[in-house]
A protein has these predicted regions:
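Hydrophobic transmembrane alpha-helices of multi-pass small-molecule transporters
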Residues: 68, 183-187, 213-217, 289-292, ...
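N-terminal transmembrane alpha-helices
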Residues: 13-50, 64-79, 83, 108-115, ...
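Small-residue hotspots at the loop-to-helix junctions and early N-terminal turns
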Residues: 51-64, 140-143, 202, 274-289, ...
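Short runs within selected transmembrane alpha-helices of multi-pass transporters and secretion channels
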Residues: 77, 145-164, 172-183, 201-216, ...
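Transmembrane helical elements of multi-pass membrane transporters/channels
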Residues: 24-43, 145, 156, 179, ...
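Helix-terminus/linker motif at the lipid-water interface of multi-pass membrane proteins
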Residues: 38-56, 126-133, 189-196, 256-289, ...
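Short alpha-helical transmembrane segments in multi-pass integral membrane proteins
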Residues: 1-26, 84-151, 193-249, 305-370, ...
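Small-residue-rich hydrophobic transmembrane alpha-helices
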Residues: 56-116, 153-172, 266, 279-343, ...
Length: 448
């Protein structure tokens, strides 16, 4: 096998100044996440501007379900990332090789299962969420087409997990940029020229997903060394599969249950008028923007902690935890304040309807200054995965951010029935989950 320096030429995570290296590692991830959000926002903006408020509401009504399915694949990718990084840190390149060739099968199967589930359950799920009758046909069409891209998204997340684990966060950014630009061009063509509305946006999205997956898999097939992909070696190794699934499945379950709690919230929002639903849909684009920018540091947290754990450098594990927490908190705070200041121009990107903008501003007014609180929760979860713990963090998130939210909806929101009482659910659940998650990480860090 090649030496570590040859294989991880982009970044050595176990030596050198952590703060600078974490930032270098995270910046391409931030741009990747920012581009991904920008391309998703372009979908919504094109629909809102050229297909009308009803089409905007249709696409917005699918956001939680898409987040759920994407979260499952992100969870699997997170498992690939953590296990690969651990073995890279330990310089166990044979296990890296087995992890990569096992994971590609696991992720692809997950993508296929989501595709089938999407085709079968899209409309029933939207009906359970009390989607407005005037929106459900467009929402169903968009969702069913969009989920046909699940296998491609699964393979992209696999490749991204592998490359991030070995310190390469630049190539995924390049591939995402290429596919994203194509996505924008196709959006405009299908919606404005072909007048396909939400269907056109969905088709453009899945074409872009397959392009990004093709690019990243093509690179791995041409890469030498332990993390390169070889068709003849693709097979499931039981130990590698168990290691990836031990982290990936709880993470996927966490994302799924978290999204289910948000489905309950969306159902509550759907109890208001369609104008409120559309305003909320426009404002939630900020959620993706801010969360995903912060998430770059969580990926760094898991990767750096796993590699340094593998290299038996315990002091760098704790320093990584605090550095990524500081970075993610500041990112959430700065972006939240900027959103509050520029809330109207932001909402005008998606709609020109004053009533819709008004209800979007209500959501932003509550959320803008509390996004940063989520850093304490998500960073602790990422750190726990980095040290190989995923089941209990999932249970903590389920109790604090799923069960608690459902109880809140059935009690506090049911009593007040205001948007403010609904939106406060986020910061309170984040705080409770963060307290438990940080206690858990601190306990297990001492036992490393």
């Amino acid at each position: 096998m090649k030496s570590r320096a040859t294989q991880t030429k982009e970044l050595d995570m176990v030596n050198g100044p952590l703060a600078r290296k974490i930032l270098i590692y995270s910046i391409p991830l931030m741009f990747s996440n920012l581009l991904q959000v920008f391309f998703n926002m372009t979908d919504v903006a094109v629909v809102g501007k050229f297909a009308g408020a009803r089409a905007l509401g249709s696409v917005g009504s699918t956001t939680i379900i898409i987040t759920l399915t994407t979260g499952i694949l992100l969870g699997m990718g997170g498992g690939v990332n953590a296990v690969t990084a651990l073995h890279m840190g330990a310089e166990d390149y044979q296990r890296v090789h087995k992890t990569v060739h096992t994971s590609v099968i696991l992720c692809f199967i997950a993508g296929l299962l989501l595709l089938v589930a999407g085709l079968v359950f899209s409309k029933p799920l939207l009906e359970v969420m009390n989607t407005k009758p005037e929106l459900i046909d467009g929402a169903t069409a968009y969702l069913m087409i969009y989920l046909c891209g699940s296998p491609a998204l699964a393979l992209y997340n696999f490749g991204n997990g592998v490359l991030s684990a070995v310190g390469d966060t630049k190539r995924p950014l390049i591939y995402l940029s290429i596919s994203g630009i194509i996505n924008i061009v196709l959006n405009l063509f299908f919606v404005i020229v072909c007048r396909l509305g939400v269907i056109g946006v969905a088709i453009a999205s899945i074409i872009a997903q397959y392009i990004s997956a093709t690019l990243i898999i093509r690179f791995l097939l041409k890469t030498y060394g332990s993390y390169g992909l070889r068709m003849k070696d693709i097979a499931i190794d039981r130990d590698a599969a168990a290691a990836v699934l031990r982290i990936g499945v709880p993470a996927a379950i966490q994302y799924s249950l978290f999204a289910i709690a948000n489905i309950c919230i969306q159902t509550s929002i759907n109890s208001f008028s369609h104008v409120v639903v559309e305003g909320n849909s426009a404002a939630t684009n900020a959620d993706s923007l801010i969360y995903d920018m912060m998430a770059a540091f969580y990926t760094a947290c898991t990767s750096f902690i796993a590699q340094n754990l593998g290299a038996r450098k315990k002091e760098r594990v704790l320093r990584t935890f605090f550095i990524t927490l500081a970075y993610s908190f500041l990112m959430g705070l700065v972006l939240g304040v900027a959103l509050f200041i520029f809330q109207r121009p932001f909402l005008l990107l998606f709609t020109s309807d004053d009533a819709v903008i008004h209800y979007g501003q209500i959501r932003i007014g509550v959320m803008a200054f509390v996004y940063c609180v989520s850093a304490f929760m998500d960073n602790a979860t990422a750190a726990a995965r980095g040290i190989g713990k995923s089941v209990m963090p999932t249970i903590i998130v389920v109790m604090g951010s799923v069960v608690f939210r459902i109880i809140w909806l059935l009690t506090v929101f049911a009593y007040f029935k205001t948007l403010q009482s609904l939106y406060l659910i986020y910061v309170i659940s984040w705080t409770l989950t963060a307290i438990a998650g940080n206690i858990y990480f601190a306990y297990h860090y001492r036992r490393i």
